[in-house]
C-alpha cells in the first residue's frame, strides 16, 4: 500500500532481542561504522576505521551505538538505544567488512542499523605480533627520553602513509598546550611498555 503524500515514513522498530539494556563494557573501542546493508538476507557492510580489520573479524560480539546527535528528541530515543549483536560470520570485502549478525534477518533490519558506530571490547582484539601495538594501547602513555626527561603524554597518532607518528601533548612554560610529533619507528624508539603506560624515545626536549 502506498503511503499518503506528505505522511512521514515510520521508523522500523528494532527487535527487543537486539537491544542492550545493561551497562556498557568499560573497554569498548570504536572500530568502524555500518555503511549499508549488504544483500537481502540481513548482512551489514562496515567501514573500518583502520586498514587492518583483524579486530573486527576476530570479535564475535559487536556493540552498535548511534553517533551523538544535537537536539535528540524523545521520538529518537528508541533508535539511540545500544544494540548488541552476535556475529555468525564475517569477511573482508573491497576495503570493508561484511557480516551476518544473529537476529538481523532481512535487508530492512540491516538498513535500520546504517550509520551506527561499531564498538568491540579491547579484550576481544587478537593478540598483536611481537613488536606490534594497537593504537588504543598507546594513547595515554607517558613519553620520556633516555635522559629521563618527560616529553609529554600520547594524545593520538597520525598515519602519514609511510609510518605512524605519535602526537605527544605537553604543557609549555607559559602554560599553553604544546604538541610534539615523534615518528613511531625503530630509529627513535627505545622501549614501549603498554602495561606500564610508558614509552622511551631518543628525542630531545628542544627538537
Swiss-Prot record:
An accessory protein needed during the final step in the assembly of 30S ribosomal subunit, possibly for assembly of the head region. Essential for efficient processing of 16S rRNA. May be needed both before and after RbfA during the maturation of 16S rRNA. It has affinity for free ribosomal 30S subunits but not for 70S ribosomes. InterPro entries: PRC_barrel-like_sf, PRC_RimM, RimM, RimM_N, RimM_N_sf, Transl_B-barrel_sf. The keyword rRNA processing applies. HAMAP family: Ribosome_mat_RimM. One of its GO terms (biological process) is rRNA processing. This is Ribosome maturation factor RimM. It comes from Cupriavidus taiwanensis (strain DSM 17343 / BCRC 17206 / CCUG 44338 / CIP 107171 / LMG 19424 / R1). Belongs to the RimM family. Signal peptide: none annotated. It comes from the Bacteria. Disulfide bonds: none annotated. Residues 130-207 form the PRC barrel domain. It holds the Pfam family RimM. Binds ribosomal protein uS19. PANTHER family: RIBOSOME MATURATION FACTOR RIMM. It is found in: Cytoplasm. Keywords: Chaperone, Cytoplasm, Ribosome biogenesis, rRNA processing.
Amino acid at each position: 500500500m502506498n503511503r499518503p503524500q506528505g505522511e512521514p515514513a515510520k521508523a522500523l522498530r528494532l527487535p527487543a532481542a537486539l537491544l542492550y539494556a545493561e551497562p556498557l563494557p568499560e573497554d569498548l573501542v570504536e572500530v568502524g561504522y555500518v555503511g549499508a546493508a549488504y544483500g537481502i538476507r540481513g548482512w551489514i557492510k562496515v567501514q573500518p576505521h583502520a586498514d587492518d580489520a583483524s579486530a573486527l573479524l576476530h570479535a564475535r560480539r559487536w556493540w552498535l551505538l548511534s553517533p551523538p546527535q544535537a537536539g535528540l528528541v524523545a521520538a529518537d530515543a528508541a533508535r539511540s538505544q545500544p544494540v548488541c549483536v552476535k556475529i555468525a560470520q564475517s569477511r573482508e570485502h573491497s576495503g570493508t567488512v561484511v557480516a551476518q549478525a544473529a537476529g538481523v534477518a532481512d535487508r530492512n533490519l540491516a538498513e535500520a542499523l546504517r550509520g551506527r558506530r561499531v564498538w568491540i571490547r579491547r579484550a576481544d582484539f587478537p593478540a598483536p605480533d611481537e613488536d606490534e601495538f594497537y593504537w588504543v594501547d598507546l594513547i595515554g602513555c607517558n613519553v620520556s627520553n633516555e635522559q629521563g626527561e618527560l616529553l609529554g603524554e600520547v594524545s593520538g597518532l597520525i598515519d602519514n602513509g609511510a609510518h605512524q607518528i605519535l602526537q605527544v601533548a605537553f604543557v609549555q612554560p607559559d602554560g599553553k598546550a604544546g604538541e610534539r610529533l615523534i615518528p613511531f619507528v625503530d630509529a627513535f624508539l627505545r622501549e614501549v611498555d603498554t602495561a606500564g603506560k610508558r614509552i622511551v624515545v631518543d628525542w630531545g626536549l628542544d627538537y
